[in-house]
Amino acid sequence: MSTTHETPEATAEGDKPCIAVVFGGRSSEHSISLITARSVLRAIDRDRWDVVSVGISTDGAWFLCSQEELEALLDDQPMAQLPVGVHRVSLPLQTGDSRLLIHDTSEHGAPLSRGRHIDAVFPLLHGPFGEDGTLQGMLELADLPYVGCGVAASAIGMDKHFMKLAFQAAGLEVGPYTVVHDRTWRTDPLGVREAVAELGFPVFVKPARAGSSFGITRVDEPSQLDAAIATAREHDLKLVVEAGIDGREIECAVLGGHGTDEARASLPGEIEVHGHALYDFEAKYVESDGATLSCPARLPEHVIDTLRRDAVRAFHAVDGEGLSRCDFFVTADERVLINEINTMPGFTPISMYPRMWAASGIDYSALIDELITLALERPVGLR
């Protein structure tokens, strides 16, 4: 698969487009974002792009954080949180002013030291306040191109309830589920228990708007339900309860198309989890042997074709741009059910999204180039 595209015209400040790699953030996935950013900063082509790296603390402060500082932090503490740096940054949020304003907040620093022209932003934040449309809306206000989905797609892709509605509207098959709103649980818990029982056990109780499998519990019998709901509510007061599906877990990666070209789907991969009841946080990010990926998945060719087609359909169902990862179940009778879409999938060395593209002919560095190029080609604003 060819991925060669011309580098956009360089800016006046340098001979290469300047990309702001942004990471950290206020969500529970802060540490995962740092691991993702370290991988991208190691692999990005410095001959093609100028790079400025920007951290966001858990309380929302933006500041310069060099690759060396990030590497040292993660070497010392693999699941670290960013300390606030002295060189704070901000965006002017003004059309035509594509600068990253850099403030020196050290004891004797000037109130404003300089501005840095930015051509595009590569947001590597996971979860709320990062991949849910909030950051994307701010970048739209700042008139800055950025990698990945826009405001609406990001918001839909963060909410397991609304993404399922979008899938169903597009004619994609989803498994049985029910939604538990905060008010409903507080005023009618018996009704919630009855609705869940109608799904049949086992079920999976999930926060509607959390990622990386935070707060997810498998429930095998009614007596376990209330505790699972309490666990999920620590992450989100809106929950989705899904019926357990007897099927294989298959993923497919999607890349947006250039211009009027169709979006592209990778070869699908199959996740095999080791030593865990489900594909949880530890299996995804901590244990290198927590899960294995077979890519391409060992499936009949017509099922692979269906998965790739449905991944692109799901991408368009949420108005996707740039990238996404779609998660499916394939049953013994070859039914394909879509479970979720992730508009900012994991991007670490053991993450499924880059591994599926590597198996499909696009290596990690080339994938980063492709995503940045797609961002620079795309206008901001209504499109």
Curated annotation (Swiss-Prot):
Pathway(s) served: Cell wall biogenesis; peptidoglycan biosynthesis
InterPro entries documented for this protein: ATP-grasp, ATP_grasp_subdomain_1, D-Ala_lig_Van_CS, D_ala_D_ala, Dala_Dala_lig_C, Dala_Dala_lig_N, PreATP-grasp_dom_sf
Enzyme Commission number(s): 6.3.2.4
Record's subcellular location: Cytoplasm
Cofactor section: Mg(2+); Mn(2+)
Main location per the UniProt record: cytoplasm
Positions annotated to bind Mg(2+) 2: 340, 342
BP GO terms, sorted: cell wall organization; peptidoglycan biosynthetic process; regulation of cell shape
Reaction equations catalysed: 2 D-alanine + ATP = D-alanyl-D-alanine + ADP + phosphate + H(+)
Residue positions binding ATP: 196-251
Keywords: ATP-binding, Cell shape, Cell wall biogenesis/degradation, Cytoplasm, Ligase, Magnesium, Manganese, Metal-binding, Nucleotide-binding, Peptidoglycan synthesis
One GO CC term on file: cytosol
Cofactor annotation comment: Binds 2 magnesium or manganese ions per subunit.
Top-level EC class as recorded in UniProt: ligase
Domain ATP-grasp as annotated: residue spans: 164-373
Residues binding Mg(2+) 1: 327, 340
UniProt-recorded Gene Ontology molecular function terms: ATP binding; D-alanine-D-alanine ligase activity; metal ion binding
Family: Belongs to the D-alanine--D-alanine ligase family.
Function summary: Cell wall formation.
Protein name (record): D-alanine--D-alanine ligase
Species for this entry: Kocuria rhizophila (strain ATCC 9341 / DSM 348 / NBRC 103217 / DC2201)
Gene expressing this chain: ddl
